[in-house]
């Protein structure tokens, strides 16, 4: 992996704690950073984003090598971590700061995301329409350090939250098997 070959991908899928591990454990991923994007406040804090006044959503920014793990595969992993039929948040996390968005860094990513969304919608996997937003990537602000790699630092809390939030059951019911 050389720095020149690396690209960025940005996904919002509810609580960013739950979005890191599924990507971080894939080959070709250099790093996954939890943060905030899509809003109007410069360098927002977690408290500000949760207040709903910044316009930002919790998101992750992935640095990846597309020769090892192409963007198409990242989008596939993304869908399998979210409820793409819920635009008002994800699982127990409600509101604009938890809305699902695929933030595209270029036209190629946008085309891939749009085709993937259309295919998922046409597949009939879900009874409701796929409402995940596809938007142009904006400035990404890394979250506070205690949010980074949460699944490694706070394993029991992370695993409990996956279950208590309803995310784990939804993923099992809709994506496993």
Swiss-Prot record:
One of its GO terms (molecular function) is peptide-methionine (S)-S-oxide reductase activity. InterPro entries: Met_Sox_Rdtase_MsrA_dom, Met_Sox_Rdtase_MsrA_sf. The active site is at residue 15. Disulfide bonds: none annotated. The keyword Oxidoreductase applies. Keywords: Oxidoreductase. Its EC number is 1.8.4.11. One of its GO terms (biological process) is protein modification process. Pfam families: PMSR (PF01625). It is an enzyme of class 1 (oxidoreductase). It catalyses: L-methionyl-[protein] + [thioredoxin]-disulfide + H2O = L-methionyl-(S)-S-oxide-[protein] + [thioredoxin]-dithiol; [thioredoxin]-disulfide + L-methionine + H2O = L-methionine (S)-S-oxide + [thioredoxin]-dithiol. SUPFAM superfamilies: Peptide methionine sulfoxide reductase (SSF55068). Has an important function as a repair enzyme for proteins that have been inactivated by oxidation. Catalyzes the reversible oxidation-reduction of methionine sulfoxide in proteins to methionine. Belongs to the MsrA Met sulfoxide reductase family. HAMAP family: MsrA (MF_01401). This is Peptide methionine sulfoxide reductase MsrA. The lineage of its organism: Bacteria, Bacillati, Bacillota, Bacilli, Bacillales.
């Amino acid at each position: 992996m050389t720095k020149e070959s690396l690209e960025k991908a940005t996904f919002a899928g509810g609580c960013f704690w739950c979005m890191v591990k599924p990507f971080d454990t894939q080959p070709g991923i250099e790093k996954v950073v939890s943060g905030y994007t899509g809003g109007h406040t410069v360098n927002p804090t977690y408290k500000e984003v949760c207040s709903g006044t910044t316009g930002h959503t919790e998101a992750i920014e992935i640095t990846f090598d597309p020769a090892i793990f192409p963007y198409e595969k990242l989008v596939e992993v993304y869908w399998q971590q979210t409820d793409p039929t819920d635009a008002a948040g994800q699982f127990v996390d409600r509101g604009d700061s938890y809305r699902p968005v695929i933030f595209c860094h270029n036209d190629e990513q946008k085309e891939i995301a749009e085709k993937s969304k259309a295919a998922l919608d046409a597949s009939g996997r879900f009874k409701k329409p796929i409402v995940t937003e596809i938007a142009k990537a904006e400035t990404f602000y890394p979250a506070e350090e205690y949010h980074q790699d949460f699944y490694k630092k706070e394993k029991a809390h992370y695993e409990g939250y996956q279950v208590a939030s309803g995310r784990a059951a939804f993923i099992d019911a809709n994506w496993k098997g």
